[in-house]
């Protein structure tokens, strides 16, 4: 628990201190965000707000993760694990794709960065590598970071995927989550606040898995997760970094995370869901992100098949703005919904454990 608190504190400190430095730097360089012309009129005043704030989030996560392990090693703790490094590697790779996308948007002074093919290839390459590596690095107990068995709150023994199918499944998960967070990042602080809650929920889940790991506490309800404590540190670092960034990203935002941050954070959810064996539960925890990306898919399908739109604008947080909700009202209500979803997800996780132990 001490390491988790250190991870949160370090990430928050780095993020909250580095972000204003980036604001000044990006403002001097003219790295301003372009706004969609067809977006809500109230967003036009945001044109020129510095972007690529995801750099501070990733820096906070990495400094926290490595710093916490340095402290842990000094106190006879363990070093970085394959699972933790794999999740962070995925997030960083996606963050690099997002950074390139953001940079092109800024250089060309328009809200279009990498073309769809290049961006998709970048995301798929990161996802493919993650899927392949997730089944490597078996420990003394034979556990790898990922499992070919589909998982809800733990592995579902009756649904085992062939290695190739598992890799393709990871590609779908990573692509879906990175795009989901990316679509959600359209209002000041919305994605950062929601991500902080989802990551906090994952801290509780992975720490409970650590306390009830089959490797150290065999018995009813134990969890076969390779590095649960290290995953808790990753989740704690991500939560802290998002909170620190939110200090500057809350309405009215002084900086946006850009695709640098949103794609990376989507990778965090995807990576944690695979390595903690909670792939289906993640849909509950990240219900807001799922709803946002679903609204985009529904809007596209409806328009292509009927010529009509379901929402005034997608993602659907803009729909509520266009029907008269203030931006801050949408943000706060969506945060509340995320808190409810995370509470429900943790309750489902704990309830399953109670059932497993016969309580």
UniProtKB/Swiss-Prot annotation:
Membrane topology term reads:
Multi-pass membrane protein
Tell me one GO molecular function of this protein: UDP-N-acetylmuramoyl-L-alanyl-D-glutamyl-meso-2,6-diaminopimelyl-D-alanyl-D-alanine:undecaprenyl-phosphate transferase activity
Q: What does the record list as GO biological process?
A: cell division; cell wall organization; peptidoglycan biosynthetic process; regulation of cell shape
Q: List UniProt keywords, sorted A-Z.
A: Cell cycle, Cell division, Cell membrane, Cell shape, Cell wall biogenesis/degradation, Magnesium, Membrane, Metal-binding, Peptidoglycan synthesis, Transferase, Transmembrane, Transmembrane helix
The protein's annotated catalytic reaction(s) are:
UDP-N-acetyl-alpha-D-muramoyl-L-alanyl-gamma-D-glutamyl-meso-2,6-diaminopimeloyl-D-alanyl-D-alanine + di-trans,octa-cis-undecaprenyl phosphate = di-trans,octa-cis-undecaprenyl diphospho-N-acetyl-alpha-D-muramoyl-L-alanyl-D-glutamyl-meso-2,6-diaminopimeloyl-D-alanyl-D-alanine + UMP
Bilayer-spanning residue ranges: 3-23, 55-75, 84-104, 120-140, 156-176, 187-207, 231-251, 255-275, 280-300, 334-354
Q: One Pfam match, by short name?
A: Glycos_transf_4
Cellular localization per UniProt: Cell membrane
Q: In which pathway does it act?
A: Cell wall biogenesis; peptidoglycan biosynthesis
One Gene Ontology CC term in the entry: plasma membrane
Keyword Transcription regulation among UniProt keywords: no
EC number(s) from the headed UniProt entry: 2.7.8.13
Required cofactor(s): Mg(2+)
Q: What is its main location?
A: membrane
Matches recorded under InterPro entries: Glycosyl_transferase_4 (IPR000715), PNAcMuramoyl-5peptid_Trfase (IPR003524), PNAcMuramoyl-5peptid_Trfase_CS (IPR018480)
Enzyme class per UniProt: transferase
Q: What's the stated role of this polypeptide?
A: Catalyzes the initial step of the lipid cycle reactions in the biosynthesis of the cell wall peptidoglycan: transfers peptidoglycan precursor phospho-MurNAc-pentapeptide from UDP-MurNAc-pentapeptide onto the lipid carrier undecaprenyl phosphate, yielding undecaprenyl-pyrophosphoryl-MurNAc-pentapeptide, known as lipid I.
Family of the protein in this entry: Belongs to the glycosyltransferase 4 family. MraY subfamily.
Q: What PANTHER family does this protein's entry cite? A: PHOSPHO-N-ACETYLMURAMOYL-PENTAPEPTIDE-TRANSFERASE, PHOSPHO-N-ACETYLMURAMOYL-PENTAPEPTIDE-TRANSFERASE HOMOLOG
- The protein, known as: Phospho-N-acetylmuramoyl-pentapeptide-transferase
Gene for this chain:
mraY
